[in-house]
Amino acid sequence: MPPSSPPASTQLQSRLFRLPRELRDVIYHHYLYNEDGLIYSFETNKLPVDLSLTYTCRAAALELRGLALRLNKVVFCTTYPHAIRTHAFLFHRALSELHALKFNLLNLQAPRLLTEAIQKEVSVKYPQFSRVLPTLGTPGERPNTLGEPPSTYRDFVHFTLNLLYDRKHHPKLGGKRSERKRRSLRKVNPEPWSTPNERGRLPRGAEGKFGYCAQGRLGHDLAATFDRELQQLVDITRTHDRVGTMKHSLSAAACAIRFLRSLRVGTREHVRQIELIEDRESISFPECHGRGLISFCREHPKLRVHRRVSLWKNAFPVTSVIRYQLNGRYSEDDRLSSSYVSKAVAKWMVEASILPSLGMPEGSFKLTFECDSAPAETTQVFNVLQRDAAWQTALDLSYARHILPQPTWHQRRLRKAYVYETFPELLEQVTNCDHPFIHCDFHPGTVCNPEEIIRERRGDSLEEWRAAWLDHTPREFQTPANMPPWHVLRAGFIVWDVWGGARFHG
């Protein structure tokens, strides 16, 4: 129902208001509609909407209220704000360090503090990780999502760590200062989709001056103080030339969340369509940033979010070694490796697939993998995913049929040929166009038959299976003809992980 306006007789000074409301609505549509949508500006935190007509009179303002947001999609792109480049770099590094440190602390304290009651409570909330709990405390144990969505694994670690230091379970826990400092770590859980400089996340002020201690690396001091904010981290990094040479971009989803949070509820309720163009590598676990949109979709049932992920410029780019040095050496040798591409794409799939279980309303969210105008070449890469999904299924069938020795729960999930628990099923749904909200704008490859793999490998040992899985054909891909070479396409946009390497496949 359009907003009511004063009778036309009171607006005789304007020819516009002598027209019927239906004709005025047509004029408003032509005046406000933009086929390309309203492109968000991070610098201004605004949209390019011409509101001149709303200032002519109250009647026009009333009839036009919120119409631009209802008529147009709002478009957000992966953004590199030069003004906060150091903030973005530090936030990304701090977040990566934080989650690594939390797991280390959990692994260190579990033998002393993990009770049966805590194990039971964790197993109820995170049953998929119930078999992880008895192994906590193993020397040398490293963080591994064990086939579950990475964000779920981080939630599990945070939840369990909180229980370890909960006075409900350990009422007499206290004591020395270092123990209190360790306990404070459990409270820190910043949202990955928070944008640097957002109030309450990272402080404003001179770049590089965040109050971090200049002594030692974070991972070397489990007793580091983590009070209220992420800026209390201890020496997350040395701020070196990499800040200036690499573009640590913000995801389109993070930009959208920033904008939506800045709107009043009365304004936000007019937004109907959001398009997220994820066309570059970005910071802070971008594949899980859809979680930050759940509350808005629940609050506004008419809101529809379409997340478009560029495969060649965003999802595909991973590497297994440090090939990108600051001086450019070795970069020309880099290619898209077949050994890591399945895990890279599957991570986006599994993170999106759990959104409904976290509260995303049905029909509110859609994820599209885009081929960047190279459908044939992208299909060839997806044939690797099809092959790896079939291998994961073939191995599971071989275990069940006693063709291969039955592995332990951990052994199965740590093997090279294992991607994610739900990966084969998700890829099959996407290939058959059966998934309700994950799609491709190209043909997603040819399905492989796991039974054929079992027949071909019958009689092989587990070691021979492992060697055969590593023998991908082709082993690597160069970019399609319509794009720059792989190392040029990635140059300047590589998101480096906490250990100094380029974004890793896991």
Feature map (PLM): residue ranges:
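Phosphate/pyrophosphate-recognition segments in soluble nucleotide-handling domains
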Residues: 254, 307, 335, 343, ...
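A two-mode feature
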Residues: 306-321, 410
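Short, surface-exposed structural microsegments at secondary-structure boundaries
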Residues: 1-273, 278-301, 322-329, 355-356, ...
